[in-house]
Structure formats: C-alpha cells, structure tokens
Regions:
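A conserved SF2-helicase RecA2
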Residues: 183-238
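Conserved helicase ATPase core of P-loop NTP-dependent helicases/translocases
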Residues: 116-118, 125-164
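Inter-lobe coupling linker of SF2 helicases/translocases
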Residues: 1-114, 224-226
Length: 238
C-alpha cells in the first residue's frame, strides 16, 4: 500500500453513527491474511523441557449430581436453574467442591514442595485457602490479589485462570496442579507455560489434572483433547 489512506479505503468500514472513529468491519480479510502469512517468520524454539501430564482421578457426589440433572434445581440457592450455564455451574460445583479433591492436592504436596495451583471458582479458592491451616505458605493471584510468586523452599501459589493464565512467569517450581479444568484448550496451554520458561533450571515439568468420572468432566476433557472450547449449550442439549 502506498499509504494509510489507500489501506483504509480498500479494507476498512467505519461506523457512521459512532461519536469517534470506530471500525465496524474489515473488507477482503482473505487478502490481509495472505499478506500476514507472507511477512511472518517462523522462529521455532528448541526447549530443553519435557511436560509430564498426569490425570488424578477423584470421586464426587454422584447422587447429588444425578438429582440436579433430573430436577434442574439449585440446592445451594434453593431455586430452579434458569439456563445451560447455570446448570453446568452446578454440575461443576458438585464435582469440584469435594473434600476428596482437596485430599488429592495434599497428596501432590507430599511429593512436590513448590506448587502452582490453577482454579476457576471462588468456592474452590475458599477450600484451597485451607492449605494455610494445614501448614503451607499460601499466596494468591486473582482479581483481588496479585501476590508475587512466593519464595522459599516450600509454598503454594493459588492462581485463577482468568487473572493469571498469562502475564507472569515462574522458574522456581516444576509442578502445576489444575484443581479444575478450564473450558478452553488455549487457556490451559497458556497456564502450563507459566512454569515452562527458557531459563527454568528444570528439565521435567509435572502437570497434574484433577478429574472425575462425571459427564461434565469427561466432556470438558474431550474438548481440551481436541483443542476446542467446551460448549455448555451443546452439552446440555439445547
């Protein structure tokens, strides 16, 4: 393109009703994608690390899960479920907010002294905060707290996916626990990368996924294995 004006004239449509210049859509995006592929240079990075992924199977309250599935009723709020998102949230709470899942974390901490734990929901955070009472040094990275990566020989770093799947790095731990799975393969991959850095001293990195045999956990795992995003409405059948 000779100049910015030529590019805008050919590819950009502005919103005529906006109070300031606002792009409404782009034209001939296939041409732009072709230009992008031509100018990008592939720079493969040879990593010295190996990611060891292990699934830890934990049980859940199957009776409560089944009852919610049949009645579509929220036992915590004592009200009917309104939509697919609400029902999936309840399924996940039954599965994730279980003492046996917390016990699985304690087993991992017996083998690994410095652990990053990713979680989704506030009720998971509340349970994981119990690690402090169990004698562990606990720091957090979420929407309310941005504690730095802990220091010392033994610690736990509780990180919420939305806040901390990217934007920080850690080279003092070789272990990550996914207390619950994220819906997105991309987010899970970004989270794993927090400890997989070029300057990490570790050659083996351990990733533990806590999973149950519940239908929703199996469906989320399937979406992640296919590098997709889990779809709540498709899962519920709406």
């Amino acid at each position: 393109y000779k100049n910015r004006t030529e590019f805008i004239r050919r590819h950009v449509v502005f919103d005529n009703f906006a109070k300031f210049p606002q792009v409404q859509r782009y034209l001939e995006t296939g041409v732009l994608e072709n230009y992008r592929r031509q100018i990008l240079v592939d720079m493969p990075v040879e990593r010295h690390t190996v990611r060891v992924r292990r699934s830890i199977h934990v049980k859940h309250d199957e009776e409560l899960y089944s009852r919610i599935s049949k009645t579509r009723f929220d036992p915590w709020k004592d009200e009917p479920v309104q939509n697919a998102g609400g029902l999936c949230y309840l399924f996940r709470r039954v599965v994730n907010d279980d003492s046996r899942r917390y016990a699985a974390v304690l087993d991992v901490l017996k083998r690994h002294p410095r652990v990053v734990i990713f979680y989704n929901f506030d009720y998971e955070l509340e349970r994981l905060r119990g690690l402090e009472k169990d004698g562990f040094s606990v720091s957090e990275y979420n929407g309310r707290r941005h504690d730095p990566v802990p220091e010392g020989e033994s610690w736990v770093y509780l990180v919420q996916y939305t806040s901390g799947a990217e934007g920080w790095n850690c080279t003092t731990s070789d272990t990550m626990v996914f207390y619950s799975l994220n819906y997105s393969y991309r987010v899970m991959e970004q989270a794993e990368g927090r400890i997989d850095r070029l300057n990490t001293p570790y050659s083996k990195l351990f990733y533990y996924r806590l999973v149950s045999n519940s239908p929703i956990d199996r469906a989320i795992q399937d979406a992640i294995s296919r590098k997709k995003v889990f779809n709540e409405r498709a899962f519920i059948g709406l």
